[in-house]
Amino acid sequence: MTATIAVHEFISADGVFESPSWTFEFGFDPKMGETLAAITGNASTILLGRRTHEMFAPAWRDRTAEDDPGAPFFNETEKLVVGANEPAEEWANTTRLGAYDADAIRRLKQERDGVIYVSGSGQLVRGLIRDGLVDEVHLFVYPISLGEGDRFWAEGEQNKLVLQAHDVYDNGVVHLSYGLA
């Protein structure tokens, strides 16, 4: 029994993934939803950093499948939150793991099957990548350069990637699926 960790991010062409409200002007191609459904389809757990949890909880907890086809996944799936502090937002099926601990995440992977899905959570994702815990990185690259903001890749760290798949959508977004070499 070993789970895989799949990270999904919306990023700009220059690597910014902070506060992705800038994605709204491009719309959401229905084929992007199909890709996300494929990524989350085998996920039994959502792993989030505390700040991302605090952004996602109020955005998702009251949504229904009629509002967004992704709502049942986000609301019904077990959520584990990594952070030194208790999340300020309540959300069903959420458990706090405590501060980041690579060994605890390794045990989590060994104890589970399927996919552990991660979105946003920059500090957490950088730690997971640095500690060799990420199996897949799904980047939805938007055709815009923002020039400033929190970047996905940690400054000064090199990561070799292996392209697994790619998709191009009518709104100009490109999905790049990578494994870490």
Which residues does each predicted region cover?
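Enzymes that bind and transform nitrogen-containing heteroaromatic metabolites
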Residues: 1-181
